[in-house]
Design a protein with these regions (language model features):
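Conserved coil-to-alpha-helix start sites within the AMP-binding
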Residues: 1-5, 20-24, 149-167
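Structural core segment of the AMP-binding/adenylate-forming
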Residues: 9-83, 97
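Conserved G/P- and acidic residue-centered "switch" motifs that form tight phosphate/ATP-binding loops
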Residues: 11, 111, 168
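Conserved AMP-binding A3 loop
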Residues: 103-130
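Conserved AMP-binding/adenylation subdomain of ANL enzymes
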Residues: 126-145, 153-168
Length: 168
């Protein structure tokens, strides 16, 4: 989940993508969102390889792996996640921005046409996550375990990537 914090923390937008979208919908979503970097699990390499020519705005692909576990693939310029973070300065100065700045982006399933984008601000993300922590809502606590059943690309994962750490 560190990407949730890192991406929105630098002022970028964390766009989680539904890998079950059709080829056409996936192309639409990636291009409509202007995704410049795609982080992907190794299991999604075939999906990206089949679509990569249709993503002209995407300039970087990062596999969630270390150098030792990097597979051969046909994704130009692909890099491994561990190499990316190891190149960064540990003394990063976090930017400041308005709480209404965009933080997350999810798309609907597109049952009535192209998927629709839903943009979440930092403020809405915090409020959504805090609401999940309320006793009669999610009733999260340090002594509890959370098994998310909602996909990360659905409704910003119901705030779970942020609510769980808030709860300890």
């Amino acid at each position: 989940f560190e990407l949730y914090f890192a991406i929105s923390g630098i002022g970028a937008i964390c766009h989680t993508i539904n890998p079950r979208l059709s080829s056409e919908q996936l192309t639409y979503v990636v291009n409509h969102a202007n995704d410049s970097i795609i982080f992907l699990d190794l299991t999604f390499i075939p999906i990206i390889e089949a679509q990569i020519a249709k993503f002209p705005k995407t300039t970087r692909y990062v596999l969630m792996a270390d150098r030792e576990h990097m597979p051969q693939c046909n994704i130009p310029g692909v890099m491994c996640y561990e190499d990316l973070i190891n190149k960064q300065d540990e003394d990063y100065i976090w930017p400041e921005f308005d709480e209404n700045t965009a933080s997350g982006l999810c798309y609907t399933s597109g049952t009535t046409g192209n998927p629709k984008g839903v943009l979440y601000s930092h403020r809405s993300t915090v409020l959504h996550s805090l609401l999940s922590c309320i006793y009669n809502s999610g009733s999260f606590a340090p002594s509890r375990k959370i098994l998310p059943i909602v996909p990360l690309f659905h409704a910003n994962a119901w705030g779970l990537p942020y609510a769980a750490p808030i709860s300890g």
